[in-house]
Design a protein with these regions (language model features):
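N-terminal auxiliary segments of SAM/dcSAM-dependent transferases
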Residues: 2-70
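SAM-dependent Rossmann-like transferase core, predominantly class I methyltransferases
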Residues: 57-130, 135-150, 161-164, 170
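Structured loop/turn residues at beta-strand edges in well-structured enzyme cores
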Residues: 26, 107, 157
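A generic helix-loop boundary/linker signal
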Residues: 1, 21-22, 85, 112
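Short, flexible coil/linker elements and helix-boundary hinge sites characteristic
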Residues: 46, 104-105, 156
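N-terminal processing/targeting junctions
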Residues: 38, 171-172
Length: 172
């Protein structure tokens, strides 16, 4: 067991070549919440004893360039919690802007197809807000389709994901 303040200092110092202080601190608190289910408030209140091995292993992975989302297998996209691993790209903030733009346009289409769906982030975020719209996703990768389907089930969203090579196959 080790003091939380020391682990935080190890993270901020250990990640300073990759992230600025604020980003490193945010990553530490994300890891803290993921490992211990504790948040920044718990830290302030002094709940300070943690398992060092887990934090050390995560820090080593971060220093080796593995994104925190791949380590925890979690990310949030447009308020939709998603499972991610190295078989799909981590959704970017710019992609959230795309979803926001589509929603602002108030498109009256009854069907949307997300091509190259990956984790399913776009399709799932749109379906969550456009409940009366049929949203499907396609990808060439079996692993990506498994992850997208898992994310749909975990979020209780009715999105169908199909294997499709957009350069060779026909879309119906």
């Amino acid at each position: 067991f080790m003091k939380l303040s020391l682990i935080k200092a190890l993270y901020v110092d250990g990640l300073k070549k990759i992230y600025n202080y604020t980003e490193a601190e945010s990553i530490f608190y994300f890891v803290l919440n993921w490992v211990e289910k504790k948040n920044k408030t718990d830290v302030i209140l002094g709940l300070e004893t943690l398992l060092i091995d887990t934090y050390r292993d995560i820090l080593i992975n971060l220093k080796n360039g593995i994104p925190v989302q791949y380590i925890t297998n979690e990310t949030i996209f447009y308020t939709v919690p998603l499972y991610v691993d190295e078989n799909v790209l981590i959704p970017r903030p710019e992609t959230e802007e795309l979803v926001h733009w589509v929603l602002e346009e108030k498109i009256s289409k009854t069907k949307i197809l997300d091509i190259g769906t990956g984790s399913g982030c776009i399709a799932l975020a749109l379906k969550k807000r456009l409940v009366n719209t049929i949203v499907d996703g396609c990808d060439i990768s079996d692993q990506a389709l498994e992850i997208a389907t898992k994310n749909a089930v975990n979020n209780n969203l009715d999105v169908t994901f199909i294997k499709l090579d957009i350069l060779k196959d026909t879309i119906n």
